[in-house]
């Protein structure tokens, strides 16, 4: 007796109207994560994972490419509105927001969530170049 082939069910992508874009812009890299309102990650992309290595990773253009890749990945969820949370002092802060805006998302809110110590840990020593 032949077995009937088991068909895998297609996973239905849930439709989400608005989400949150978390941008972590350090001096060396930029990480873009798009989540739903509860914080469940829908897609993420980095400047390093987008093909940039070394010092090119820390450029505004690399951050822009990472944002475009992340935006392309969440299009299937039907995302329309984005709230943007920016963390860090890196060069990719502004270009990432511009890229998300150009990708067709309506940016409702931009918040800077860079952690500021209330005189916490001792900072690293100053660079001598």
Curated annotation (Swiss-Prot):
PROSITE patterns: RIBOSOMAL_S11 (PS00054). One of its GO terms (cellular component) is ribonucleoprotein complex. Keywords: Ribonucleoprotein, Ribosomal protein, RNA-binding, rRNA-binding. The keyword RNA-binding applies. Pfam families: Ribosomal_S11 (PF00411). Part of the 30S ribosomal subunit. Interacts with proteins S7 and S18. Binds to IF-3. Belongs to the universal ribosomal protein uS11 family. Located on the platform of the 30S subunit, it bridges several disparate RNA helices of the 16S rRNA. Forms part of the Shine-Dalgarno cleft in the 70S ribosome. This is Small ribosomal subunit protein uS11. The gene is rpsK.
